[in-house]
């Protein structure tokens, strides 16, 4: 793949907006345009940046998947001094940082929200300039925006994009709205469970319905820690290399039980299996493999604003939706995020949801195979549309109105 990406939308490249046979409402999304080219702007492809808690996804608008998927960490250490000058920091991102035990690691995002802007900017700049090899002055940037993101964070983002990255234009788009677009819809109830946070958001005609948003500070990272403590039988802090191993075990072997109590009641020996760790030692795992993702359905009381579990969160979100929209939402329940990829998740989720809503509910649960990329794909679709090109926040508008312009144009 050419790391520089296409400079213009190529007509033979297409995005599948309807990958499933599930009924889809006709979308107002128009044919892709793929260039940023209104008065006073450049004719270069936009870049979509989805900054999750665990992973940063980045690539060109109009592509079907991100060009770079990078672990969202920065590692630093002082450079060796050869003169009496002040020591400078040597910095790495992603796997390059994670593989160096001598580095001090920084995690720029916590529970979906950027908390370290210096580290976040370093990741963006590194991928844009060193990996994609582009001049940020020539490319508009579309950033994704999580639920409950403070307005001050959006303003800071605009400031970094214009003042530091020198982008000609930016846009900040709701993650849940982008997930709806990725599913070929403009209406839907998004159920997103990723690395740091889970939430449910009803979306109507491309806008969030704020009163229906439910959030739970329990997602993939919490599950990995739970699995580590269960398997290692320790309440002490787990080492970094242990967490890596547990993450791999979680992704390869954990599953969601269709009937948790029935599974729990089966003899322990039915579940025992021995796994060899990277250091050569053997460990035994068992019921932890389905107890781990069960927390998404029955979380502990310490999991943040909502301790309801995902199906109950959907029920609460639906209860806030105007009655005339409820059937539309029930028929467009969209699973998104990497922590929804467990084997058995989709079936159990739908069973639990139907049990709560009753037999009269006509629930349609949509679970695309690439749903861990839903937010980025939605951003790629949006930023490539001709009808969208007038919605970019331009540098001239920022210079005239200041960073609060994003609150007006990106609502």
Curated annotation (Swiss-Prot):
Its main location: cytoplasm. Interacts with ACTL7A. The gene is Actl9. It holds the Pfam family Actin. Residues 1-23 are annotated as: Disordered. GO terms for cellular component: acrosomal vesicle; actin cytoskeleton; perinuclear theca; sperm head. InterPro entries: Actin, ATPase_NBD. Residues 1-15 have a biased composition (Basic and acidic residues). This is Actin-like protein 9. Testis-specic protein that plays an important role in fusion of proacrosomal vesicles and perinuclear theca formation. It is found in: Cytoplasmic vesicle, Secretory vesicle, Acrosome; Cytoplasm, Cytoskeleton, Perinuclear theca.
């Amino acid at each position: 793949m050419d790391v520089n990406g296409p400079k213009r939308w190529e007509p033979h490249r297409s995005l599948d907006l309807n990958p499933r046979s599930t009924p889809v409402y006709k979308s107002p999304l128009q044919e892709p345009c793929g260039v940023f080219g209104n008065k006073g702007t450049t004719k270069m492809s936009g870049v979509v940046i989805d900054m999750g808690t665990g992973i940063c996804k980045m690539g060109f608008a109009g592509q079907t998947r991100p060009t770079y998927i990078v672990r969202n960490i920065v590692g630093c250490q002082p450079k060796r001094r050869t003169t009496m000058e002040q020591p400078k920091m040597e910095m790495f991102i992603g796997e390059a940082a994670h593989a160096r035990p001598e580095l001090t690691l920084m995690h720029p995002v916590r529970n979906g929200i950027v908390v370290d802007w210096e580290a976040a900017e370093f990741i963006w700049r590194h991928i844009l300039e060193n990996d994609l090899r582009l001049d940020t002055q020539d490319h508009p940037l579309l950033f994704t925006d999580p639920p409950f993101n403070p307005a001050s964070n959006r303003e800071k983002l605009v400031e970094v994009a214009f003042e530091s990255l020198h982008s000609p234009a930016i846009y900040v788009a709701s993650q849940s709205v982008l997930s709806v677009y990725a599913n070929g819809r403009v209406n839907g109830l998004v159920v997103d469970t990723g690395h740091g946070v889970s939430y449910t958001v009803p979306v109507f005609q491309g806008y969030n319905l704020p009163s229906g948003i439910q959030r739970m500070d329990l997602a993939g990272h919490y599950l990995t820690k739970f699995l580590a403590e269960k398997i290692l039988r320790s309440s002490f802090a787990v080492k970094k290399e242990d967490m890596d191993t547990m993450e791999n075990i979680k992704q390869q072997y954990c599953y969601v039980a269709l009937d948790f109590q029935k599974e729990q009641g089966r003899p322990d020996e039915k579940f025992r299996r021995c796994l060899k760790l990277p250091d050569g030692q053997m460990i035994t795992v068992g019921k932890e493999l389905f107890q781990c993702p069960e927390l998404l359905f029955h979380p502990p009381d310490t999991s943040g604003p909502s301790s309801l579990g995902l199906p109950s969160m959907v029920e609460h979100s639906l209860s806030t939706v105007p009655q005339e929209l409820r059937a539309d939402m029930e028929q467009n329940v969209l699973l998104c995020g990497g922590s929804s990829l467990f084997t058995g998740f989709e079936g159990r989720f739908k069973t639990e949801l139907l049990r709560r809503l009753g037999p009269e509910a006509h629930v349609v649960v949509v679970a695309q195979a690439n749903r861990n990329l839903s937010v980025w794909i939605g951003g790629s679709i949006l930023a490539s549309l001709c009808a969208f090109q007038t919605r970019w926040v331009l540098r001239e508008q920022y210079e005239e109105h200041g960073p609060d312009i994003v609150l007006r144009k990106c609502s």
